Amino acid sequence: MDASYRRDGRGGGGGGGGGGSAPRSVEDIFKDFRARRTAILRALTHDVEDFYAQCDPEKENLCLYGYANEAWQVALPAEEVPTELPEPALGINFARDGMNRRDWLALVAVHSDSWLVSVAFYYAARLNRNDRKRLFGMMNDLPTVYEVVSGSRQSKERDRSGMDNSSRNKISSKHTSDVARVENNIKEEDEGYDEDDGDHSETLCGTCGGIYSADEFWIGCDVCERWYHGKCVKITPAKAESIKQYKCPSCSSKRPRQ
């Protein structure tokens, strides 16, 4: 692989922005993270047959790269030492034939999650504490590659579907207008996702981390704007009707500045 391909993280077609400059703002770093994540997800789901074939155990140490133009590539690691960017897990091809296929893909997914975070925080090294915290929150709002590939996110959905739904459809009109639109099919969630589609990212409960579902009662905090299962914060639809401004437990416990 050409060294410049790996350095600017965009691949031959370019991923936006000239001169191979590194992303510097929280928004630009998150955009880079999201694009690389989309590339990795495509390799491990939509293009999995091609990816599997390229990871020949007879070849040398191979790595899975995701780029900021949403392209992926199986290639040898960078020759320069130290590398300009953190490198993904080395030798993913060696374990391919010695493991169950699903387990092997899950293992690659776990290592890919680690790599995606390391690249993002390599770029975030010069951000201040609050910006790093905000960046991590944005990244953490997306399911991990492992969750998507292993299906653990969907399993949690099935577990919740068996709960009593007698009051789930009674969602306060006060709190429904701002509910984020959620993609139902997780494995296709990032296809075609661009910088203007931020409102389509998954909404997760601020308490339990569960994914938003329209058949459950949710309430949004008017201070931090995070969303919560009503049952997680002990708020019923009837109680929500009488609340003019809802503060989540976290915001309620914060002392006002003197």
Curated annotation (Swiss-Prot):
GO cellular component, one term: nucleus
Comp. bias intervals (Gly residues): 11-21
Record's compositionally biased regions (Basic and acidic residues): 1-10, 175-187
A Pfam family that the UniProt record links to this protein: PHD
Entry-linked SUPFAM superfamilies: FYVE/PHD zinc finger
Segments for region (Disordered): 1-24, 150-200
UniProt subcellular location: Nucleus
Keyword Transcription: yes
Sorted UniProt keywords: Chromatin regulator, Metal-binding, Nucleus, Transcription, Transcription regulation, Zinc, Zinc-finger
Listed InterPro entries: Alfin, Alfin_N, PHD_AL_plant, Zinc_finger_PHD-type_CS, Znf_FYVE_PHD, Znf_PHD, Znf_PHD-finger, Znf_RING/FYVE/PHD
Recorded superkingdom: Eukaryota
UniProt feature, compositional bias: Acidic residues: 188-199
Presence of the UniProt keyword Nucleotide-binding in the record: no
GO biological processes: chromatin organization; regulation of DNA-templated transcription
Positions of the record's site feature: Histone H3K4me3 binding: Y212, W218, D222, W227
Xref: PANTHER family: CPG BINDING PROTEIN, PHD FINGER PROTEIN ALFIN-LIKE 1
Subunit structure: Interacts with H3K4me3 and to a lesser extent with H3K4me2.
Protein name listed in UniProt: PHD finger protein ALFIN-LIKE 1
Organism for this UniProt entry: Oryza sativa subsp. indica
